[in-house]
């Protein structure tokens, strides 16, 4: 088999840059077991600069080449890209739009699906359109007195709320508010991360996650795993990634089989309905009354040592490297 040149693009320069690098480490490890890929890892920084692991400045050109600033070095033809970038500009769909413009095949969801899922406003509209219940919410497009008053009414109605920047991942710009004293400051902070803000009712529920992905053209939804947070906390950025995190992860949650099957069916419905591709992690709430609510969809889930997606995929009986290779080669035929 002829080797294919695979660009592992990571970083992105956003709030999740460091996590993207950790995920890229996992992809590198898996790709190293696949001799038919010749891998070049390139980091994209906040200034929009591309740099190899050897520290060489370079750029991805419209002719689908990595061109080095050192003119004495020959350009490197790119056959395929893995955009291992959490948050902007990866999960937002921006970098995928560029790949589509230059007709460069890549791993993961396309630009439109990525954008629709990443923005919490459009995502929740899609969930409702697909007939999948989700948390009650309002959304705001400006930080002003009217927004504060609307949020105060939501707090009075629901008792406790989450204020979330609409265009952020990994709980960046996300604040739990239980009283009016916290409200205005939390709202102002959320608007620093995004021009749109979602205000959601706080749901006291179990947090369940499903790995939804494709193998040989078939959509797979694993049994739900579970995130167990310390009492009265939520799964914040620090809880997800800090070494001293108190959160626990369970690869296969202890839930009724009927409930688990329903969650898997919702995950597949969301995957199909939102035109996802290759991989996703779909997160749900399960209330004490066994009500299932779709929380969010992550179109490029983390692949760190503590990340659920690769563990759930493996627990479901799939080898990650072979799953990855199968999806890549299907596009390169």
Curated annotation (Swiss-Prot):
Binds 2 magnesium or manganese ions per subunit. Its EC number is 6.3.2.4. Mg(2+) 1 binds at residues 283, 296. It catalyses: 2 D-alanine + ATP = D-alanyl-D-alanine + ADP + phosphate + H(+). Its cofactor is Mg(2+); Mn(2+). Pathway: Cell wall biogenesis; peptidoglycan biosynthesis. Coiled coil: none annotated. Keywords: ATP-binding, Cell shape, Cell wall biogenesis/degradation, Cytoplasm, Ligase, Magnesium, Manganese, Metal-binding, Nucleotide-binding, Peptidoglycan synthesis. It is an enzyme of class 6 (ligase). This is D-alanine--D-alanine ligase. It comes from Shewanella halifaxensis (strain HAW-EB4). The lineage of its organism: Bacteria, Pseudomonadati, Pseudomonadota, Gammaproteobacteria, Alteromonadales. The gene is ddl.
